[in-house]
Curated annotation (Swiss-Prot):
Keywords: Metal-binding, Transferase, Ubl conjugation pathway, Zinc, Zinc-finger. InterPro entries: ATL1/ATL16-like (IPR044600), Znf_RING (IPR001841), Znf_RING/FYVE/PHD (IPR013083). The lineage of its organism: Eukaryota, Viridiplantae, Streptophyta, Embryophyta, Tracheophyta. Probable E3 ubiquitin-protein ligase that may possess E3 ubiquitin ligase activity in vitro. One of its GO terms (molecular function) is zinc ion binding. Pathway: Protein modification; protein ubiquitination. The gene is RHA4A. This is Probable E3 ubiquitin-protein ligase RHA4A.
Length: 174
């Protein structure tokens, strides 16, 4: 008869446990490696996405930067022209008379409020919120609604024409 306390039985039991632990360890290593690799790729994706969202656009770059390259110089000159253009635009206060023409800004789709400062485009006479049209003019040279050209020369001539002939209608360029 086999003695229940024979040395063979306790010796086989720990080997079976060791084998199962070894197999579990071997199978868990690739799984853990895959999870870590997936997390690293996900963090890399999140970092790239956050940096692309927080990176400033060319119109927000500081003009007085001392380490500008030659590729930034045209945008700086363009930025100066845009600032000069926005200073030349006619600012009006919203009233009932303007409310019959336009009641909301087509840039932000927000409604105009009474006595709110708005910008009137020189040729087409469309009106927009002050901040909305300034943001628009940083990247465009046209009216957001009808796409008529807005330039410094057309703004000056429009102001001169208004002073010479206040009753004459303005025509938009084709």
């Amino acid at each position: 008869m086999v003695d229940p306390q024979s040395p063979i039985t306790p010796h086989l039991y720990p080997q079976a446990i060791q084998l199962k632990l070894y197999q579990a360890f071997i199978f868990s290593i690739p799984i853990l490696f895959s999870i870590i690799l997936f997390l690293l790729f996900y963090l890399f994706y999140l970092k790239r996405r956050a940096s692309s969202l927080s990176s400033p656009s060319p119109m927000i770059l500081p003009v007085s930067s001392s380490h500008q390259t030659s590729s930034h110089l045209p945008s700086v000159c363009l930025l100066d022209v845009k600032v000069e253009l926005k200073d030349k635009l006619h600012v009006v206060l919203f009233n009932e008379e303007l409310g019959t023409r336009d009641s909301l800004c087509c840039v932000c789709l927000g409604e105009f409020e009474l006595k709110e400062e708005l910008v009137e485009m020189p040729l087409c006479k469309h009106i927009f919120h002050l901040d909305c049209i300034h943001l628009w003019l940083y990247s465009h040279n046209t009216c957001p609604l009808c796409r008529s050209s807005v330039s410094i020369s057309s703004t000056k001539t429009s102001v001169d024409d208004d002073n010479d002939h206040p009753d004459s209608p303005q025509t938009s360029p084709v």
